[in-house]
Design a protein with these regions (language model features):
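Conserved ABC ATPase signature
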Residues: 3, 27-31, 35
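Conserved ABC ATPase "signature" region
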Residues: 5-23
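A short, proline-enriched helix->beta-strand linker immediately N-terminal to the Walker B motif
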Residues: 46-50
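ABC ATPase nucleotide-binding domains
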Residues: 117-145
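Catalytic Walker B motif of ABC-type/P-loop ATPase nucleotide-binding domains
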Residues: 52-56
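A short, surface-exposed alpha-helical micro-motif characterized by mixed small hydrophobic
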Residues: 90-92
Length: 145
């Protein structure tokens, strides 16, 4: 019926948005880890949520697909809560971040205010340095034990 056709359109749009149309007829078990990750994000988008909670949405993805997924979810007209362990990626992709240590909040706010050398060093017990990269003129965190 009409609902089935609408559902098919929604699924098709989610697959298209994540460049997964070529995988539509494949079994999940035949896909690579990165392909499966993208399928799971598309599956969540097909539900048309207002709030999307993603646990490591870039895990198992090559850098191009990481950037594509983050750009895609950033452009969605909904609230996204995502766990990302790559602090530089989180800084570039997120409006606000929550820095946790052992399940406790160390800070919440804009990435530049939260991902300071002092706070990141404290959270992860590493030496942290914020450096400006040339020629992009972007800031980047580096770490040492």
């Amino acid at each position: 019926g009409a609902n089935g056709a609408r559902d098919a359109q929604i699924v098709q749009a989610a697959l298209d948005r994540l460049c997964l149309l070529e995988f539509a007829d494949r079994q999940l078990g035949t896909l690579s880890g990165g392909e499966r990750q993208r399928v799971m994000v598309a599956r969540a988008l097909a539900q048309e949520p207002r709030l999307l909670i993603l646990d490591e949405p870039t895990n198992h993805l090559d850098i191009r697909h990481q950037l594509e997924v983050l750009a895609l979810i950033r452009d969605l007209p909904l609230t996204i809560v995502a766990s990302l362990h790559d602090l530089n990626m989180a800084s570039a992709a997120c409006d606000d971040v929550l820095l946790l240590q052992a399940g406790r909040s160390l800070g919440f706010g804009q990435p530049d205010a939260i991902f300071t050398e002092k706070m990141v060093s404290s959270a992860f017990r590493v030496q942290t340095c914020r450096e400006r990269l040339a020629p992009s003129n972007t800031e980047h965190l580096t770490f040492k034990l």
